[in-house]
């Protein structure tokens, strides 16, 4: 039973092309490509907005109060 070989996938592809036709498959491919492009553009816009928000917070002149600690490396002699 194992995995499908390349011949199985080619037969499935031919059957799908016969059932739906190449024009319908082309339209589905274009719609899917447009959706992926829209998603990527949306993610890019969200990242740009997050970066701008972070830069605005940093340049706001805020000071963080805290305690600095030295990192001491211990060596075994």
Curated annotation (Swiss-Prot):
TM region(s), chain numbering: 1-21
Residue segments, region Disordered: 50-77
Family annotation (InterPro entries): TatA/B/E, TatA/E
Cell compartments where the protein resides: Cell inner membrane
GO annotations of cellular component type: TAT protein transport complex
Chief localisation class: membrane
UniProt keyword terms in alphabetical order: Cell inner membrane, Cell membrane, Membrane, Protein transport, Translocation, Transmembrane, Transmembrane helix, Transport
Compositional bias annotation for Polar residues: 53-62
Membrane topology: Single-pass membrane protein
Annotated Basic and acidic residues bias: 66-77
GO biological process entries: protein transport by the Tat complex
Domain of life from the UniProt record: Bacteria
GO molecular function: protein transmembrane transporter activity
UniProt cross-references to Gene3D superfamilies, sorted A to Z: 1.20.5.3310
Subunit annotation: The Tat system comprises two distinct complexes: a TatABC complex, containing multiple copies of TatA, TatB and TatC subunits, and a separate TatA complex, containing only TatA subunits. Substrates initially bind to the TatABC complex, which probably triggers association of the separate TatA complex to form the active translocon.
Family of this protein: Belongs to the TatA/E family.
NCBIfam families referenced in this protein's UniProt entry, alphabetically: PRK02958.1 (NF002813), tatAE (TIGR01411)
UniProt-listed PANTHER family: SEC-INDEPENDENT PROTEIN TRANSLOCASE PROTEIN TATA
Role summary: Part of the twin-arginine translocation (Tat) system that transports large folded proteins containing a characteristic twin-arginine motif in their signal peptide across membranes. TatA could form the protein-conducting channel of the Tat system.
Name of the protein: Sec-independent protein translocase protein TatA
Organism: Azoarcus sp. (strain BH72)
Gene name of the record: tatA
């Amino acid at each position: 039973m194992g995995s499908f070989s390349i011949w199985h996938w080619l037969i499935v592809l031919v059957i799908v092309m016969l059932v739906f036709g190449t024009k319908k498959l082309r339209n589905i491919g274009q719609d899917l490509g447009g959706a992926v492009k829209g998603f990527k553009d949306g993610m890019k816009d969200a990242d740009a907005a997050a970066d701008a928000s972070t830069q605005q917070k940093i340049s706001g002149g805020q000071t963080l109060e805290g305690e600095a600690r030295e990192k001491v490396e211990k060596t075994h002699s």
